């Protein structure tokens, strides 16, 4: 515990919170080009093959984005839009790829929560 005189000499430093999505440059979304599309396994105790893509953004950052939903049409050189939002069981994945935007198709046969997966309203 510092004394009053010590606090007058050097006041307490305000702790800055670190940015959780540095590649977005304070933008809601960013556009980028897929450089690699692959699957990876989550950390314990989960087990799956999660679909992810390495994306080179317009500002030069290279980030890993998660591809949500069942099935996708992404391949190398696909132009995608990313948003912030990490995937808890995939270390290093801090962004989500938006479905139904640019080259990414929406999820087929999606009935509920369609807007999150870029699916049109079924007839």
From Swiss-Prot:
Pfam family, one: Ribosom_S12_S23
GO cellular component terms attached to this protein's record: small ribosomal subunit
Highest rank taxon of the organism: Bacteria
Signal peptide: none
GO biological process, one term: translation
Residue(s) carrying 3-methylthioaspartic acid: 89
GO MF annotation list: rRNA binding; structural constituent of ribosome; tRNA binding
Keywords for the protein's UniProt record, in alphabetical order: Methylation, Ribonucleoprotein, Ribosomal protein, RNA-binding, rRNA-binding, tRNA-binding
Function summary: With S4 and S5 plays an important role in translational accuracy.
Subunit: Part of the 30S ribosomal subunit. Contacts proteins S8 and S17. May interact with IF1 in the 30S initiation complex.
HAMAP family: Ribosomal_uS12_B
Record family assignment: Belongs to the universal ribosomal protein uS12 family.
Protein name, entry field: Small ribosomal subunit protein uS12
Organism: Methylobacterium sp. (strain 4-46)
């Amino acid at each position: 515990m510092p004394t009053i005189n010590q606090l007058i000499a050097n006041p307490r430093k305000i702790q800055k919170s670190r940015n959780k999505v540095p590649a977005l440059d304070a933008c809601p979304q960013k556009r980028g080009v897929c450089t690699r599309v692959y699957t990876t396994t989550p950390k314990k105790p989960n087990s799956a093959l999660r679909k992810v893509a390495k994306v080179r953004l317009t500002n030069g950052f290279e980030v890993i984005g998660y591809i949500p939903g069942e099935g996708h049409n992404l391949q190398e050189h696909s132009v995608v839009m990313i948003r912030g939002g990490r995937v808890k069981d995939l270390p290093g994945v801090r962004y989500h790829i938006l479905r139904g935007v640019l080259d990414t198709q929406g999820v087929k046969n999606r009935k509920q929560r369609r807007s999150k997966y870029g699916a049109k309203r079924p007839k």
